[in-house]
């Protein structure tokens, strides 16, 4: 039997413009995943893309990755990796991660499918990879999957690594390929790009392990339902079995949408509800308030809560509809009620008519004339 760890979308080096602690969060969860690999005594690691948050990572990101590779290399744990859409080198540039190939890093399929045969515990394993292909490379992707199918013929144990969004697992309009385009003669298909955990039996076992840390508040629901984690895969006689391991160093996030009267209580309520899951790190709260309240008042209120970090709150003010005389059907009366200015009402009527006529030049002339008058 062969055992390996599958992780993806670690986004090492990602930062927040407003919360300084976020950069360290991505390092923490990546390093935790590496420690899990060592504790599980895996034979190798699969990383299916977006290792770094950018194709030109900073020195601190490179140092974190170098230290991890040295630790893995000391234990003879190689890493097989494809590029995602974030860390794929531009044109003829070299890969940042590639300088650590001497520490056991194998980059597969930069511009086309590539595969490698390795032996672990006396068992031959074929590992193939295709880096992210979108834009002008999208039309090439199906052909690369066909190459992958041909290359793995004759291997009992095989793994395909790919960083793509697949229909119907993801939104069809944002996908580069369909599940049916994948080669079905692999034991395990290690996907990357989606940040939530997905496991599917499609013939072979397919999985997106998801990101190791949240990149946006769209991932909050997935975090609260399943957590963030990595996959430990046992591969034996062509059959892959998946064991999910949750990461403990993930910083929790919450989204609270409320009104000026109740937002503080709702924040306290959700923090109490998930108190046992949050862990040592203060969670981040993304607050949206619907109603009339000043930002200064909100900031003063939030100082009363010590157990969370807050992104800049959003205040969505409710705009009162103009009071139009009952039974009115005149557009001018609507403009007058809303603008409360005769001159602006005249301008609005003219711009409306020019818009209806499709006369862009007349609209520009009216606007320019108004600017000169003022």
Swiss-Prot record:
One of its GO terms (molecular function) is manganese ion binding. Nuclease activity is regulated by Rad50. Binds 2 manganese ions per subunit. It holds the Pfam family Metallophos. Keywords: DNA damage, DNA repair, Endonuclease, Exonuclease, Hydrolase, Manganese, Metal-binding, Nuclease. Mn(2+) 2 binds at residues 50, 85, 163, 193. The keyword Nuclease applies. The active site is at 86 (proton donor). Its cofactor is Mn(2+). Belongs to the MRE11/RAD32 family. Part of the Rad50/Mre11 complex, which is involved in the early steps of DNA double-strand break (DSB) repair. The complex may facilitate opening of the processed DNA ends to aid in the recruitment of HerA and NurA. Mre11 binds to DSB ends and has both double-stranded 3'-5' exonuclease activity and single-stranded endonuclease activity. Homodimer. Forms a heterotetramer composed of two Mre11 subunits and two Rad50 subunits. This is DNA double-strand break repair protein Mre11. It comes from Thermoplasma volcanium (strain ATCC 51530 / DSM 4299 / JCM 9571 / NBRC 15438 / GSS1). The lineage of its organism: Archaea, Methanobacteriati, Thermoplasmatota, Thermoplasmata, Thermoplasmatales.
